[in-house]
Amino acid sequence: MIFVDTNVIIDVSTDDSAWADWSQEQLDSAVRREPLAINEIVYAELSVGCRFPDEVDALLTRFGIVIDPTPRRALFLAGKAFQRYRRAGGTRTGVLADFFIGAHAVIADSVLITRDGGRYRTYFPGIELITPSVN
């Protein structure tokens, strides 16, 4: 299973001028190798740009993405990684979701497609990422 970060789905669904092509190429390549998945956190983040759950579901169907429920071990790992981040001076807002996403990919022993590799590499050493070469 290959996990997909929120930004990759948003890039393609909004036809982002800077990232849509890269993100679409990664999704196309990945889906030929393994099933694509997100967790509940990514679903919640995607809902911000939609009016109804059916719209989020349609996005997932469009890209062939399934929802993989977050295991408790991943929730625990996310909390511990976020704790390290805060102790290192990280802000309280806007990043906790990334820790849930990264921890889930680690516990599932999965690859994560994202444009934001830095934080994942720092707090989840050894995580396998597909990122743009600029990261």
Task: Give the label of every model feature segment.
Residues 66-115:
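Active-site neighborhoods of divalent-metal-dependent phosphate/nucleic-acid chemistry enzymes
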Residues 12, 40, 71, 116:
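Nucleotide-sugar donor-binding loop of glycosyltransferases
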Residues 8, 42, 74, 100-101, ...:
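Alpha-helix capping/helix-boundary segments
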Residues 33, 62-64, 109, 126:
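A generic structural signal for alpha->beta connector loops
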Residues 1-38, 47-59, 130, 135:
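Short, well-structured N-terminal submotif of metal-dependent ribonuclease cores
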Residues 45-46, 55, 77, 122-123:
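Phosphate- and divalent-cation-binding pockets in alpha/beta enzyme and binding domains
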Residues 1, 102-135:
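Acidic, PIN/NYN-like endoribonuclease modules and their adjacent C-terminal/linker elements
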